[in-house]
From Swiss-Prot:
Gene that this sequence comes from: un-7
Family according to the record: Belongs to the transglutaminase-like superfamily. PNGase family.
Keywords: Metal-binding, Zinc
Molecular function GO terms recorded: metal ion binding; peptide-N4-(N-acetyl-beta-glucosaminyl)asparagine amidase activity
Name of protein: Protein png-1
Binding site for Zn(2+): C150, C153, C182, C185
Region (Disordered): 363-412
GO biological process, one term: glycoprotein catabolic process
GO cellular component, one term: nucleus
Amino acid sequence: MAGNNSGGGSYPLDDHVKSVARDLQHRFAQMSNRDQKFDLHVIPDLLSQPVVPEPPAQDDKEAQNFEKYLIAMSHIPLNYENPGLLDEALQQIPLDRLSQEAEEEVELFQAKAASLGRSKPEWSHQECMVRALLRWFRRSFFTFVNNPPCSECLSPTNKIRNVAPTPEERAHSATWVELYACVTCGAYERFPRYTEAWQLLRVKRGRAGDFANVFTMLCRALDIRARWVWCQEDYLWTEIYSEHQQRWVHVDSCEEAWDMPHMYYKNWGKKMSYVIAFSREGAVDVTRRYVGSPDALLPRTRCPEGVLKFIMEEITNLHRPKYAPDGETRLRLYREDVAEDVQLRSLWSATLEQSRRLKAAAAAAARGGRSSPDNKSGANMMGSPATGDIKRPIPEDAPVPDVPSLWPTYGP
């Protein structure tokens, strides 16, 4: 047992004692920080520990409302499993053209791999098919609409207000209508905001959320495992599962972006709090895949982290049995869940380590020292940002980083 002996020395801590100590610290954090659970510093070693799921407290109305909201959203990707919708989608996809483009791109990746002495190309035919779909979808099929042009004279329009949908528009899933006026002829232009992928597939225009809605459905039409990804800060995109790389890949059909998870905070300066991926297989908190800096993480105040973990498991248990009825498939998906959870926690640990090194170097420079971070260029220290190929493992005795983090000490 660890502790001080009579001679004033100390016994070494074995793994069991360390585990018990972490568990006690975990439980203490849960009890003492239930109301002030987000203004905490993160210990990298503790961050690598899994979150313990817990249901929303009976008096936590905000967490209960968040639970209901996420469960409601989890039904959206289930609409993509409609056989009639998928058949209609397949009729609109130029399969021969996309397949030919995919074959040509696969050959390029194979040639590149051979020139580098690698036996495995970066992407397989499956991913190249999605890449071809992405190019066709953004460039030829779906149109981004800010202010719709006047249907009478094609002149620009200005928005007046939101109005209620007509019965016909409502029947086609419009929840509201944006009303615009032509700057030239004064004619009114209605822009219904549809929610169903079926109707969006027909009108072929919309904004970022509409792009993600339809593109994710088209991936399912090609029998690609796909997720509809929701960001609380008003943005949506897609993830597809790469069998070739055994991981989920970021796809933004509105920006024609492929495997660029850090695009939002690096290129846009976008800060995010919750990023949740939904599919027929369940729900996953993938925030750490897209927030590559503690400074880009907004307060996560909707519920405790343990409650969010509970909600994710609740949604998964709600939908997965229907689409993964056999034990072999469930076991495979469970193993994927575990691997992804480890990857996401590792990504965040590496992010904190990078931030700690940069802050230490900045402090040394301010004192007149010459210390600099190992990564002088500021490049991502995690190797591939999506794979989590961490180059600098965090030691167990790593110091507490002097950066504020909104992840609680008892979980990532």
